[in-house]
Amino acid sequence: MEIMYSNKSNDIIKNNNITGVYGDKLDLINSGFDFYGIEYDDEWTVKRFLNGYKLKIDNNILNIFSELEISYSLLKRKIKDLSKGQFKLILFVYIILNKKNIVVLDYFDKGLSYKYKKRITNYIKSKYSGSLIVISNDLVFLNSLCNYLIVFKDGNIMFNDEFNNIYKSRVKIEYPPIIKFIRLANNNNAKLSYTVDNKELLKDIYRSVR
């Protein structure tokens, strides 16, 4: 299950923030989290899954579909007939509608097209409120979403701080090439800001050599 939820808070998660986890869900379970999956039947239509047995479709569903650019025609489709990307979008809509205490996206970005990933990322950054945990080993994806980062290694927490501080730390993880470049440059007194945006990096380099 790529979207789960928890009704139990935990001291390592900052309330009402988006926390990235570089590790896996077992690390969180071993840290005291209880997770629940979303129950559904493959034979249900999307409308049945999101709207229950009500005849009239809830306006909140229509509004979220519009904001995420999801075709209303999907409401008539059965869950089993959705593509993987479409199903992830529908699960995300379900989570928005049901407002769980803590939502967990477990490698939600895996296999997700750039188009769908961008829609979800933009919605989370602009609209989502509440506590969200994003589990992934893609540091660029985590950086695009998260305020805080937790790094697990062998079941132990190696880092739990504001996201950008990971780049200044000595924690050994697989950094994206752009971060490796900035770290190398800063070791030679370049004083560049950490970013995963190539355009922002070029601007910073230009400012530093003026």
Where in this protein do the model-derived segments appear?
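Conserved beta-strand-loop-alpha-helix hinge in the C-terminal portion
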Residues: 156-179, 183
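A short, surface-exposed alpha-helical micro-motif characterized by mixed small hydrophobic
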Residues: 113, 142-144
